[in-house]
A protein has these predicted regions:
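C-terminal motif of bacterial Sec signal peptides marking the signal peptidase cleavage site
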Residues: 19-20
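Glycan-processing catalytic domains of CAZymes
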Residues: 24-365, 371-399
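Core hydrophobic alpha-helical transmembrane segments of single-pass membrane proteins
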Residues: 11-13
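Bacterial N-terminal signal peptides that target proteins for export
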Residues: 1-9
């Protein structure tokens, strides 16, 4: 596999634009944002693909049945500036011939193998992956999505961390992805979710691989309708832990009645729902701040607050250049990122019930990165701030 080529493919969404603002980063970058369960073959029109692009997605992942459907998707996506995560029945039965037909298409992002596999399937997936890689010449990444950590070990056949480690070692894909939707009608499943995030961060970092994570955009049992607060909580937490790609489940409303799927961004009536506009707003905000996260390295990740959840690390020392940091009992995720000579202190709310009060002081000049990506200089001394429900505060300063 061409490792440098694959890495650039994973960050294919990145565009470099020089800016002239004093003290601003040297370039603006784009996060990969993928629509899971996207436009079906029977609704594949240029208008629908433009609608997807207008919502802020730059990778389309439709569950397509045939190679013909896939080629149609690629052609439409190209016209609206979107890439495609490729899947079809023939990719598994005849990988050589499928890859030969699509590998040079400008809209191809990568190839999808399987959703939520258990350990016994890893040898087969590895064999299949090598066939695709060989046919593709290592030009595009291969992708699958892992189970969350609350799945019974009888399904995984080993403990969760070991299953992630085995996936990385045995299947040998250039990225790690997992899904966990922490917001239910009963609240936030904080213990499991943060522990899951920590495991994925640890194992992907140890292997030198990027990881991708999810937000839930479609209500179904036992998950409520998304809100801006729930989307921010899920996505900014993932980015604070080092995620390099983001995904929404789902974009198009699934037809099955088993899980009571409803009010997807494109809902059961094939119309835009309120979720469409929430996701659109969220994606604009994410891309405005993408320069903070794309290619950043996690220096440290910890938690403050009355409760330190399972698998999380309590903050034992202040991040670099931070003189004091206080929150209320609700606490926050405390992540220090570094990139291009900058530190980014990322503080993410852990509650959807109320704003989080924050007091923070630094020993150096600091700017706060707003939702529009603009940097606003903080006054010297202690700053008393409020982080909205599920929201984030981002501080930038020189190393």
């Amino acid at each position: 596999m061409k490792n440098t080529t694959i890495l650039s493919a994973i960050l294919l969404m990145t565009s470099i634009v020089f800016v002239s603002c004093q003290g601003s980063p040297a370039r603006e970058e784009k996060l990969p944002i993928m629509s899971w369960y996207s436009i079906p073959a029977e609704d594949a029109t240029l208008e629908r693909y433009q609608e997807l692009a207008d919502c802020g997605f730059n990778i389309n992942f439709s569950h397509l049945g045939s190679l013909e459907d896939l080629r149609t998707s690629l052609d439409l996506a190209q016209q609206v500036g979107v890439k495609v995560m490729a899947t079809c029945r023939e990719l598994e039965t005849s990988p050589d011939s499928v890859v030969a037909l699509v590998k040079d298409h400008p809209a191809l992002y990568g190839y999808f193998l399987r959703d939520e596999p258990a350990c016994p399937s890893f040898p087969y997936l590895a064999e299949w992956a090598r066939k695709i890689e060989y046919a593709d010449g290592g030009e595009h990444p291969l992708y699958l999505n892992l189970l969350p950590n609350f799945v019974d070990t009888a399904v995984l056949t080993c403990n969760y961390r070991e299953s992630v480690r085995r996936f990385i070692a045995e299947v040998k894909l250039p990225m790690v992805s997992f899904d966990y939707y922490p917001v239910t009608f009963g609240g936030i499943s904080s213990d499991n979710w943060y522990d899951n995030m920590q495991v994925i961060h640890d194992e992907s970092e140890a292997a030198g691989l990027p990881f991708w994570a999810f937000a839930l955009s479609t209500a179904h049992d036992p998950y409520p309708l998304p809100t801006m607060a729930s989307l921010r909580l899920e996505l900014y937490t993932a980015l604070a832990y080092g995620a390099q790609g983001l995904q929404y489940f789902t974009y198009w409303n699934p037809g099955t009645e088993v899980w009571n799927f409803h009010e997807a961004p494109i809902n059961q009536n094939k119309e835009r729902s309120e979720a469409y506009y929430l996701v659109q707003q969220m994606n604009r905000e994410l891309q405005a701040r993408a320069f903070v996260f794309v290619g950043s390295k996690v220096v440290s990740i910890s938690h403050v607050g009355k409760t330190i959840f399972r698998g999380c690390k309590a903050m034992e020392e202040l991040p670099a250049h931070v003189v004091s940091l206080e929150t209320g009992d609700d606490g926050a995720v405390v992540s220090l990122l570094e990139k291009d000579g900058w530190y980014y202190l990322v503080l993410v709310s852990r509650t959807l019930e109320r704003p989080t009060d924050l007091k923070v002081a630094f020993d150096t000049r600091v700017h706060m990165i707003g939702p529009d990506g603009k940097a606003v200089r903080l006054p010297k001394g202690e700053n008393a701030l409020s982080i909205g429900e599920g929201d984030v505060a981002i501080f930038r300063y020189r190393k």
